[in-house]
């Protein structure tokens, strides 16, 4: 008889991961759809939108901020935003542990209120280093959402793939909102308002979440429920490695594009469209269309073998990125839309792998470890974006991204197939 066991704060990440990877398909939870009130589900999805919006305000407003702070080129100010992306990744580890062991509801309250206050503080910056400090604070609170909010959302989901897809749509509508809302706020009220308005909205969401989300009971990490059947060690390590490596390369593409697309479109639409607000509207349209891909992919994940679907979407990124590298004007708009559809469409897969293989008791911690590595490394994209574009131009950047997509495809080929997982579960470790 296996004794009951409650994970302790001293439990190592490796031990936690090895104890919970399970060979089942995306699980179907027996809880009813009413376990999370609809208002709570909406607020969790809004939280994802706010998370991505906040982390990209700076990239959208960088031209205006650079001019006020006396920088001749926007590229020279971009490295000051790297702290936000670094903590966006590194902060996922403590956020995930606290989510499992303290509780996901209280951590989401810290997320909403902390993000709002950090944005208000950033709006007061009087120079580049104060701005960098404020952005880093935003990154620290933004780190909470992915390892806490998404596991909380799928904890009781009957169709996890569909839930992840819809949540991904919400997150990337936040990306679109960063392009659209920030563009209009910068033009009409100044860049400081681009931080103040979403900051107040986040605080309001925190108040609503505190009132509408009921207590969640015992934190998942302290549950005495026996762990699921584990994968053999070889497949376990393959799944973890692929999950992390693919997340790194995917995050690099996401950061390069979402942080650089505004200035990219300004450059490639020169002489066609000069209005920054209209550029922001076009970019928001690109992101809105691309976000719909996550809903479609999320539903397909529940029906199609994960490896085959993932590989197809990654391979589709390459030709679109190559076309965007050489496109101009409206042809560029078409190519960029295709590229972003495929980049956004690949996002649900790492979360789907966590739901598929990882027991809920440590799901936030495993997600936090994965995010710390992927976001931590991919934060280099923010630091490199300005210097690379300044030295070599956007054409070189998009060719580099096509190469990164090719690397992702090579990594995904190593992902265990559903058949291999089933056979391993039936026959033990090979």
Question: What do these predicted ranges mean?
Answer:
Residues 58-59, 238-292:
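Extracytoplasmic gate region of multi-pass secondary transporters
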Residues 82-96, 284-296:
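Central cavity-lining transmembrane alpha-helices of secondary-active solute carriers
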Residues 90-126, 301-304:
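Conserved MFS/SLC helix-loop-helix module at the cytosolic interface between two early adjacent transmembrane helices
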Residues 167-214:
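Helix-loop-helix hairpin linking two adjacent transmembrane segments in secondary transporters
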Residues 301-350:
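C-terminal transmembrane helical hairpin of 12-TM major facilitator-type secondary transporters
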